[in-house]
A protein has these predicted regions:
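Non-catalytic terminal regions of proteins
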Residues: 1-52
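Membrane-embedded glycan transfer/ligation machinery
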Residues: 80, 84, 112
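Post-HExxH zinc-binding segment in Zn-dependent metallohydrolases
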Residues: 104-135
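Active-site scaffold of zinc-dependent metalloenzymes
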Residues: 36-80, 93
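Active-site recognition of the HExxH zinc-binding catalytic motif
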Residues: 84-96
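Generic recognition of cysteine residues
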Residues: 38, 54-55, 111, 148, ...
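Long, well-structured alpha-helical subdomains associated
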Residues: 124-149, 154-162
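Short helix/strand-bridging catalytic loops that position acidic/His residues to coordinate divalent metals
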Residues: 96-104
Length: 162
C-alpha cells in the first residue's frame, strides 16, 4: 500500500490517497475512515468494499465539515483498470469538494479541481519515488509484481498474477 497526503490550498481541503490497497491493508484504511467520521451505512459499505480484497475497487469518503477526504484505490488487474479507478475516484473527490464549496458541478472550476488532484497523483507515481513505476508496464498486459525488478512498482491484483 502507498499512502499520499496533500492539501488543496484553494479549498483548504486535506486529501489522503491510499493506492494499491488489498485486504491486508484493511485495518489501517478503516481506522483512518473512522477517524474522519465515516460511520453507519457508509462505514459498512467501505468495510465490505475493502475487505473483499478484489481487484479494480475504490472508494472516496469526505468529511465536509472537516474539509478532508480519504480516497482508496485498490489493486488493479490492468493498467487500464488502474487509470479507470483513479479517474473514477478523483471525480468523486472533485464533486465532494465542489458541493462543499457550492460550485456549479457543470462548471470549469470542478475540472480545475480534477486537474490539480490528477497532477498530485501523478507526482506520487513519478516524482515521489526514485523508481519510475509506470515505465515497467505494457498498457495491454496485466500488471505483475514479476515485471518489476526491485518490487517497488504497482503489484497489480495478486489474484490475477498467481
Amino acid at each position: 500500500m502507498i499512502k499520499q497526503q496533500f492539501h488543496l490550498r484553494n479549498y483548504d481541503w486535506v486529501v489522503t490517497f491510499y493506492y494499491d490497497v488489498s485486504a491486508h491493508d484493511f485495518y489501517a484504511v478503516m481506522n483512518h475512515l473512522h477517524i474522519i467520521g465515516c460511520k453507519g451505512e457508509n462505514f459498512v459499505m467501505a468495510w465490505n468494499n475493502i475487505n473483499k480484497g478484489c481487484c479494480n475497487r475504490g472508494l472516496t469518503y469526505s468529511d465536509f465539515g472537516g474539509k478532508q477526504s480519504v480516497v482508496v484505490v485498490g489493486e488493479a488487474s490492468t493498467f487500464g483498470e488502474l487509470m479507470n479507478s483513479l479517474s473514477h475516484e478523483i471525480h468523486h473527490l472533485s464533486v465532494h469538494i465542489a458541493q462543499s464549496n457550492d460550485l456549479d458541478l457543470a462548471g470549469e472550476e470542478v475540472c480545475y479541481i480534477d486537474g490539480e488532484v490528477t497532477q498530485r497523483v501523478f507526482e506520487a507515481f513519478i516524482s515521489g519515488t526514485s523508481y519510475n513505476m509506470l515505465s515497467t508496464f505494457d498498457a495491454s498486459s496485466p500488471l505483475s509484481l514479476d515485471s518489476c525488478t526491485d518490487h517497488s512498482c504497482w503489484k497489480g491484483c495478486s489474484r490475477m498474477n498467481r
